[in-house]
UniProtKB/Swiss-Prot annotation:
Its EC number is 2.1.3.-. The keyword Hydrolase does not apply. Belongs to the class I-like SAM-binding methyltransferase superfamily. Cx-SAM synthase family. This is Carboxy-S-adenosyl-L-methionine synthase. One of its GO terms (molecular function) is S-adenosyl-L-methionine binding. InterPro entries: CmoA (IPR005271), Methyltransf_25 (IPR041698), SAM-dependent_MTases_sf (IPR029063). Homodimer. S-adenosyl-L-methionine binds at Y42, G67, C68, S69, D92, N93, D120, I121, N135, R202. It is an enzyme of class 2 (transferase). The gene is cmoA. Transmembrane segments: none annotated. Keywords: S-adenosyl-L-methionine, Transferase. GO terms for biological process: tRNA wobble uridine modification. Gene3D superfamilies: Vaccinia Virus protein VP39 (3.40.50.150).
Length: 245
Protein backbone atom coordinates (compact mmCIF):
# COMPACT_ATOMS: atom_id res chain seq x y z
CA UNK A 1 0.00 0.00 0.00
CA UNK A 2 1.09 3.52 -0.67
CA UNK A 3 1.24 6.17 2.02
CA UNK A 4 -1.38 8.91 1.82
CA UNK A 5 -0.25 12.27 0.54
CA UNK A 6 -1.40 15.71 -0.36
CA UNK A 7 -3.05 16.15 -3.77
CA UNK A 8 -0.70 16.81 -6.67
CA UNK A 9 -1.18 20.40 -7.86
CA UNK A 10 2.44 21.10 -8.88
CA UNK A 11 1.63 21.87 -12.51
CA UNK A 12 -1.90 23.22 -12.02
CA UNK A 13 -0.97 26.90 -12.50
CA UNK A 14 0.82 28.31 -15.56
CA UNK A 15 4.62 28.26 -15.23
CA UNK A 16 6.60 30.84 -17.22
CA UNK A 17 9.79 28.83 -17.46
CA UNK A 18 9.42 25.10 -16.95
CA UNK A 19 12.59 23.51 -15.59
CA UNK A 20 13.53 19.85 -15.60
CA UNK A 21 11.48 17.59 -13.34
CA UNK A 22 13.23 16.70 -10.07
CA UNK A 23 12.25 14.50 -7.13
CA UNK A 24 12.44 17.36 -4.67
CA UNK A 25 10.53 18.24 -1.50
CA UNK A 26 7.46 19.40 -3.43
CA UNK A 27 7.26 16.15 -5.40
CA UNK A 28 7.91 13.98 -2.32
CA UNK A 29 4.97 15.64 -0.53
CA UNK A 30 2.50 14.67 -3.27
CA UNK A 31 4.23 11.62 -4.77
CA UNK A 32 1.71 8.89 -3.83
CA UNK A 33 -1.13 10.93 -5.35
CA UNK A 34 0.98 11.86 -8.38
CA UNK A 35 2.06 8.33 -9.25
CA UNK A 36 -1.36 6.75 -8.70
CA UNK A 37 -2.96 9.30 -11.03
CA UNK A 38 -0.12 9.21 -13.57
CA UNK A 39 1.00 5.58 -13.91
CA UNK A 40 -1.66 3.10 -15.06
CA UNK A 41 -1.54 -0.14 -13.12
CA UNK A 42 0.85 1.16 -10.46
CA UNK A 43 -0.98 -0.48 -7.54
CA UNK A 44 -1.06 -3.81 -9.38
CA UNK A 45 2.68 -3.63 -10.01
CA UNK A 46 3.44 -2.82 -6.37
CA UNK A 47 1.29 -5.71 -5.14
CA UNK A 48 2.82 -8.18 -7.59
CA UNK A 49 6.38 -7.12 -6.71
CA UNK A 50 5.65 -8.45 -3.24
CA UNK A 51 4.37 -11.74 -4.68
CA UNK A 52 7.41 -12.09 -6.93
CA UNK A 53 9.73 -11.39 -4.01
CA UNK A 54 8.00 -14.11 -2.00
CA UNK A 55 8.76 -16.61 -4.78
CA UNK A 56 12.36 -15.64 -5.42
CA UNK A 57 13.88 -14.40 -2.17
CA UNK A 58 16.35 -16.82 -0.57
CA UNK A 59 17.33 -17.13 3.10
CA UNK A 60 20.32 -15.03 4.14
CA UNK A 61 20.27 -12.92 0.98
CA UNK A 62 19.92 -9.25 0.12
CA UNK A 63 16.93 -7.62 -1.56
CA UNK A 64 17.50 -4.29 -3.31
CA UNK A 65 14.98 -1.56 -4.13
CA UNK A 66 16.94 0.83 -6.35
CA UNK A 67 15.21 4.17 -6.71
CA UNK A 68 12.92 3.36 -3.80
CA UNK A 69 11.17 6.77 -3.58
CA UNK A 70 8.79 6.53 -0.59
CA UNK A 71 9.23 2.77 -0.19
CA UNK A 72 6.05 1.33 -1.72
CA UNK A 73 7.88 -1.61 -3.34
CA UNK A 74 10.03 -2.10 -0.25
CA UNK A 75 6.99 -2.34 2.01
CA UNK A 76 5.23 -4.70 -0.40
CA UNK A 77 8.25 -7.02 -0.45
CA UNK A 78 8.74 -6.87 3.30
CA UNK A 79 5.14 -7.99 3.87
CA UNK A 80 5.78 -11.08 1.72
CA UNK A 81 9.28 -12.09 2.83
CA UNK A 82 9.17 -15.05 5.20
CA UNK A 83 12.76 -16.32 4.85
CA UNK A 84 15.30 -15.88 7.64
CA UNK A 85 18.33 -13.65 7.52
CA UNK A 86 17.19 -11.38 4.70
CA UNK A 87 17.52 -7.63 4.56
CA UNK A 88 16.10 -5.05 2.17
CA UNK A 89 18.43 -2.30 0.97
CA UNK A 90 16.38 0.64 -0.30
CA UNK A 91 18.29 3.35 -2.16
CA UNK A 92 17.33 6.76 -3.53
CA UNK A 93 19.33 9.88 -4.36
CA UNK A 94 16.56 12.25 -3.24
CA UNK A 95 16.98 13.39 0.35
CA UNK A 96 13.29 14.30 0.57
CA UNK A 97 12.25 10.83 -0.60
CA UNK A 98 14.69 9.04 1.72
CA UNK A 99 13.52 10.97 4.81
CA UNK A 100 9.88 10.09 4.12
CA UNK A 101 10.73 6.53 3.17
CA UNK A 102 12.35 5.99 6.57
CA UNK A 103 9.20 7.25 8.30
CA UNK A 104 7.00 4.89 6.28
CA UNK A 105 9.28 1.90 6.86
CA UNK A 106 9.53 2.57 10.61
CA UNK A 107 5.75 2.83 10.92
CA UNK A 108 5.43 -0.95 10.45
CA UNK A 109 6.99 -3.76 12.47
CA UNK A 110 8.73 -6.59 10.67
CA UNK A 111 11.34 -9.29 11.21
CA UNK A 112 12.96 -8.25 7.92
CA UNK A 113 15.26 -5.24 8.45
CA UNK A 114 15.27 -2.40 5.94
CA UNK A 115 18.29 -0.18 5.39
CA UNK A 116 17.26 3.04 3.63
CA UNK A 117 20.23 4.77 2.01
CA UNK A 118 20.55 8.18 0.36
CA UNK A 119 22.91 7.47 -2.54
CA UNK A 120 23.30 7.29 -6.30
CA UNK A 121 22.24 3.79 -7.37
CA UNK A 122 25.08 3.75 -9.91
CA UNK A 123 27.55 3.72 -7.01
CA UNK A 124 25.89 1.08 -4.83
CA UNK A 125 27.47 -2.37 -4.51
CA UNK A 126 25.10 -5.22 -5.38
CA UNK A 127 26.04 -8.34 -3.42
CA UNK A 128 24.41 -11.66 -2.53
CA UNK A 129 21.13 -10.52 -4.08
CA UNK A 130 18.14 -12.78 -4.66
CA UNK A 131 15.80 -9.94 -5.73
CA UNK A 132 16.55 -6.53 -7.27
CA UNK A 133 13.82 -4.01 -8.09
CA UNK A 134 14.11 -1.04 -10.46
CA UNK A 135 10.60 0.40 -10.32
CA UNK A 136 10.36 3.26 -12.85
CA UNK A 137 13.98 4.19 -12.17
CA UNK A 138 16.18 3.03 -15.06
CA UNK A 139 14.45 5.43 -17.46
CA UNK A 140 15.90 8.38 -15.53
CA UNK A 141 19.50 7.27 -16.08
CA UNK A 142 21.48 8.24 -19.15
CA UNK A 143 21.35 5.51 -21.83
CA UNK A 144 25.05 4.74 -21.40
CA UNK A 145 24.59 4.19 -17.63
CA UNK A 146 21.72 1.73 -18.04
CA UNK A 147 23.75 -1.16 -19.43
CA UNK A 148 26.51 -0.65 -16.84
CA UNK A 149 24.01 -0.76 -13.96
CA UNK A 150 22.24 -3.84 -15.31
CA UNK A 151 25.59 -5.60 -15.71
CA UNK A 152 26.40 -4.81 -12.08
CA UNK A 153 23.02 -6.10 -10.96
CA UNK A 154 23.51 -9.33 -12.92
CA UNK A 155 26.94 -9.85 -11.36
CA UNK A 156 25.52 -9.31 -7.86
CA UNK A 157 22.52 -11.62 -8.28
CA UNK A 158 22.63 -15.19 -7.06
CA UNK A 159 21.93 -17.86 -9.70
CA UNK A 160 18.14 -18.02 -9.98
CA UNK A 161 17.81 -14.46 -8.69
CA UNK A 162 15.37 -12.04 -10.28
CA UNK A 163 15.47 -8.45 -11.50
CA UNK A 164 12.08 -6.71 -11.64
CA UNK A 165 12.18 -3.76 -14.03
CA UNK A 166 9.19 -1.43 -14.37
CA UNK A 167 9.35 1.25 -17.05
CA UNK A 168 7.47 3.49 -19.42
CA UNK A 169 7.86 2.14 -22.96
CA UNK A 170 8.30 3.72 -26.34
CA UNK A 171 6.97 1.76 -29.33
CA UNK A 172 8.77 1.45 -32.64
CA UNK A 173 5.54 1.56 -34.64
CA UNK A 174 4.50 5.22 -34.76
CA UNK A 175 0.75 4.56 -34.87
CA UNK A 176 0.96 2.26 -31.83
CA UNK A 177 3.18 4.71 -29.97
CA UNK A 178 0.86 7.67 -30.56
CA UNK A 179 -2.24 5.64 -29.64
CA UNK A 180 -0.75 4.49 -26.34
CA UNK A 181 0.44 8.02 -25.51
CA UNK A 182 -3.09 9.30 -26.19
CA UNK A 183 -4.61 6.57 -24.01
CA UNK A 184 -2.21 7.48 -21.21
CA UNK A 185 -3.27 11.11 -21.45
CA UNK A 186 -6.92 9.98 -21.35
CA UNK A 187 -6.06 8.05 -18.18
CA UNK A 188 -4.61 11.20 -16.61
CA UNK A 189 -7.64 13.27 -17.63
CA UNK A 190 -9.92 10.65 -16.08
CA UNK A 191 -7.91 11.04 -12.87
CA UNK A 192 -8.53 14.78 -12.74
CA UNK A 193 -5.48 16.26 -14.43
CA UNK A 194 -6.15 19.29 -16.65
CA UNK A 195 -4.73 19.85 -20.13
CA UNK A 196 -2.38 22.45 -18.62
CA UNK A 197 -1.09 20.00 -16.02
CA UNK A 198 -0.56 17.26 -18.60
CA UNK A 199 1.26 19.61 -20.96
CA UNK A 200 3.50 21.24 -18.34
CA UNK A 201 4.41 17.91 -16.70
CA UNK A 202 5.34 16.50 -20.11
CA UNK A 203 7.57 19.51 -20.82
CA UNK A 204 9.28 19.16 -17.44
CA UNK A 205 9.95 15.45 -17.72
CA UNK A 206 10.81 14.93 -21.40
CA UNK A 207 14.47 15.89 -20.94
CA UNK A 208 15.07 13.73 -17.85
CA UNK A 209 13.07 10.59 -18.69
CA UNK A 210 14.01 8.82 -21.90
CA UNK A 211 12.09 5.55 -22.22
CA UNK A 212 13.30 2.50 -24.14
CA UNK A 213 11.32 -0.02 -26.16
CA UNK A 214 10.62 -3.50 -24.85
CA UNK A 215 12.89 -4.78 -27.62
CA UNK A 216 15.78 -2.66 -26.29
CA UNK A 217 15.26 -4.01 -22.78
CA UNK A 218 15.18 -7.61 -24.00
CA UNK A 219 18.30 -7.12 -26.12
CA UNK A 220 20.15 -5.80 -23.06
CA UNK A 221 19.02 -8.73 -20.94
CA UNK A 222 20.24 -11.17 -23.59
CA UNK A 223 23.60 -9.43 -24.02
CA UNK A 224 24.21 -9.40 -20.27
CA UNK A 225 23.38 -13.08 -19.89
CA UNK A 226 19.99 -13.35 -18.18
CA UNK A 227 18.54 -16.81 -18.85
CA UNK A 228 14.83 -15.88 -18.92
CA UNK A 229 13.10 -12.54 -19.36
CA UNK A 230 9.71 -11.23 -20.44
CA UNK A 231 6.95 -8.72 -19.79
CA UNK A 232 4.71 -9.80 -16.92
CA UNK A 233 2.50 -6.68 -16.79
CA UNK A 234 1.53 -3.89 -19.17
CA UNK A 235 -1.11 -1.17 -19.19
CA UNK A 236 -0.93 1.25 -22.12
CA UNK A 237 2.71 2.37 -22.44
CA UNK A 238 3.70 1.39 -18.89
CA UNK A 239 4.74 -2.05 -17.78
CA UNK A 240 7.04 -4.33 -15.87
CA UNK A 241 9.46 -7.07 -16.89
CA UNK A 242 11.33 -9.82 -15.09
CA UNK A 243 14.83 -11.09 -15.85
CA UNK A 244 16.13 -14.23 -14.15
CA UNK A 245 19.82 -15.09 -13.79
Amino acid sequence: MNPKSNPDTIFSAPIDKIGDFTFDERVAEVFPDMIQRSVPGYSNIISAIGMLAERFVKPHSNVYDLGCSLGAATLSMRRHIKQEGCQIIAVDNSKAMVERCKLHVNAYRSDTPVNVIEADIRHIDIENASVVVLNFTLQFLSPEDRYVLLEKIYAGLRPGGILILSEKYVFEDQVSNELLIDLHHDFKRANGYSELEISQKRSAIENVMRPDSKKQHKERFAQIGFSSYDVWFQCFNFGSMFAIK
